[in-house]
């Protein structure tokens, strides 16, 4: 049995860890509240974006009927090259949050490569970058400080290169993967085809749409510009949604760690009391033996 001093040091160490995990849980809780507020604002903006895109969809449907449709909406069932854009956290200590995304990306890579499709990776988040770099895989584009502090302009800048490669036919399809916020206790892996845009993702308005835009510029230019805004927003929202899920996962992980620490302290306290009792018993026996020897 370990001596009393060693056990006492262990108890102190575990208690310090418990204080840290409790503090991290509180910090994550506060950050989650702020991130959810951002998410609500983004969701409100999403409705407006969807209204705009619904008008676009109506125009695209008309163009599609005429047999001429832009590349951003032209579905490709057999892409030669696919870009996978994925979001992970910059930090750990959030349970299986990052690995859930990484496993999904790995599965998609295997599925596409089995079909003979070339896969290129675009990573937002240090954990994803570190994992696939360690696996020896090439990461076409990386951002290791974007997922922890989502910013619309930086999100648009990140996704810009992806969109340009798609427009220039360097890649045929863009998929986005991230672990999204479901509720305070759950996260959900989300996989979406970002490009080409599926008309099923938007509600097509009729000609009486409140956004019956009559552009002064060339209609194709307006369509491209609004499509770019839609893509930018989806990247930004993925970052916010992922960050909310990250804070939620970290709260759960820290709560579990705090609970385990408490159980460990209780276990060590019992061990300490037993060791202390054994030490006292040994001392008493030695005293009694000494007294008996003097008689």
From Swiss-Prot:
GO terms for cellular component: plasma membrane; proton-transporting ATP synthase complex. Its main location: membrane. Keywords: ATP synthesis, Cell inner membrane, Cell membrane, CF(1), Hydrogen ion transport, Ion transport, Membrane, Transport. It is found in: Cell inner membrane. It is a peripheral membrane protein. One of its GO terms (biological process) is proton motive force-driven plasma membrane ATP synthesis. SUPFAM superfamilies: ATP synthase (F1-ATPase), gamma subunit. InterPro entries: ATP_synth_F1_ATPase_gsu (IPR035968), ATP_synth_F1_gsu (IPR000131). One of its GO terms (molecular function) is ATP binding. CDD domains: F1-ATPase_gamma. Belongs to the ATPase gamma chain family. F-type ATPases have 2 components, CF(1) - the catalytic core - and CF(0) - the membrane proton channel. CF(1) has five subunits: alpha(3), beta(3), gamma(1), delta(1), epsilon(1). CF(0) has three main subunits: a, b and c. Produces ATP from ADP in the presence of a proton gradient across the membrane. The gamma chain is believed to be important in regulating ATPase activity and the flow of protons through the CF(0) complex. This is ATP synthase gamma chain. It comes from Aliarcobacter butzleri (strain RM4018).
